[in-house]
């Protein structure tokens, strides 16, 4: 049975034509000076508090804005159309979030997305999809909207929704991140989907073969013990990587393995904001340690694993948008191992990162007009 439309779908859909950015600071130790950036930056256009971007097979770009707008952009950025205006809960870290075209978009025209909403018990994140259709006026609109899955339980508060989406390499299932909503303990609660990586069918049901269902966990759970998971992506060998914000210190990049416990809130390489200690990850503690972590934090936003030809030296590496660090971060991935690479200061909070069809790297800033720019990085 579909989820109740009244409880989970945006109540306003009009098909038609965050956070404030931090002030720029000095580069942190270890950052690459601006003069050493190995790419050119081209400002394509700007948005109002954008959250995610994704490329369609025809090279057009879909961008979500926090307030609920989903925008379709021509590759050169000169033509834009709002294909949906969704009623979402925008308080705090909420709003319209991730967007990813379906693996079979060329035939199905489906676009998957996530958003926060109010419901029984509080608020939560929802996975939904729609179909891109001709609007009869020379443009497009998102139609046939349906909610597929909602986090359990809904709780009070406006933070740590997560809501990132990644399709499995075979295109038969998807992975969806649920943050622990700043409540700590749900990350270790087997019945909650909060603080988890979930594996779902394309219709939002628990995917067959999930590793913890027989152990009393919610049937959607793939891994648990997570905090605020704002990036998830597969590498070329089918390994699933995830990055998440730590507390005061301890931002992480994790290799996601089925059934593993990643420790939060019982283990972290950071501390609580009030200064209380959290046990560090340690051998034999029963928790899967991060492959890379940061102290001080970078505040990781979106995650992309590079496969293009424009920057051949970076093939297979992970790229992370830094929010409080106002940077683009590269992580060198080598099989199941990872190590820190470059960190380039960008002068603004970077919310999301994606790869264009020609191998260019695209970024969106986290902020309002002229501080929510879409930027294309090309080789020098």
Please name every model-derived segment:
Residues 282-297, 301:
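Aromatic-anchored helix/helix-loop segment that forms the rim or "lid"
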